[in-house]
Amino acid sequence: MGGISAASVRGWLRHHVVMASHTSWRVGGPAQRLYRPADRDDLIAFLRFLPRNEPLLWLGLGSNLLVRDGGISGTVIAIAGVLNRIERRTDTTVWVEAGVSCAKLAKFCAREGLRGAEFLAGIPGTVGGALAMNAGAFGGTMWELVTAVEVAGIGGEHCRRLPQEYQVSYREVHGPEREWFLAAELRLTLGNSQVAQQQIRRLLRQRNGCQPIRQPCAGSVFRNPWNDKAGRLIEACGLKGASIGGARVSERHANFIVNTGNASAADVEHLIQWVAETVARQAGVSLVPEVHMVGEPA
């Protein structure tokens, strides 16, 4: 890896780190390397040392991610809690780094009397992950707020880009290859802080009432098909409670798969495949996974 060692970075660099403790499903084999930068400057310096072809996985809170049991080659860069600054730049503009949790961003905006980010309180991930997949909930989506992003690439190059440089759609974002989000500039609207905070509490009550928040899971497993809901289709096919090994379709919300305590990544992946096949056969609808699957089988 071009001479990179724990002694040459200020952050945390370890080899053969089991990813089960770094993902919200609590499954996954080892990463060849895991690096947690000390700060943004340390991250940029680290990227300068990397070979151009180094496989990279940027990790936030580990939601919406399935790491297979055989693990992943290359380097995992863990940014949650590191790139964690939020600033109000103008009356209606907020600048936020990619390692900030979506919930923290939503609460910050509400306290500042800014409206439009309340939906982010229900997304169990970081701003970086929300940017990468155009995450959404309760009718809102991340890129509706974005006015600019800051990105970095292999070699440590970093720059500012505008939304028109990306192709953004439902749960998909396509832009320049081998670049990753460092921060975003968001435009919101002025409003009442108390009303915004009440809205967040209402949305969280709604989420907590129907999602398995006390069990290891990764968020929604499948994208919603056009004009329908993946959870409704899965439930209509009688799949609530269906299980393979330690992975089970949640009885609270059919578009969630939970780890009952001893699941492997293979259990989760096989259950995802079986649910998709069953819905296709019974309902004639092809469900597309929202979960990002990486690594090799055991």
Swiss-Prot record:
GO MF terms held by the record: FAD binding; UDP-N-acetylmuramate dehydrogenase activity
Top-level taxonomic group: Bacteria
Cofactor: FAD
Domain FAD-binding PCMH-type: 27-206
Pfam families registered for this protein in UniProt: FAD_binding_4, MurB_C
Catalytic-site annotation from UniProt: R171, S220, E290
Catalysed reactions, semicolon-separated: UDP-N-acetyl-alpha-D-muramate + NADP(+) = UDP-N-acetyl-3-O-(1-carboxyvinyl)-alpha-D-glucosamine + NADPH + H(+)
InterPro entries for this protein: FAD-bd_PCMH, FAD-bd_PCMH-like_sf, FAD-bd_PCMH_sub1, FAD-bd_PCMH_sub2, MurB, MurB_C, MurB_C_sf, Oxid_FAD_bind_N
Family affiliation: Belongs to the MurB family.
UniProt protein name: UDP-N-acetylenolpyruvoylglucosamine reductase
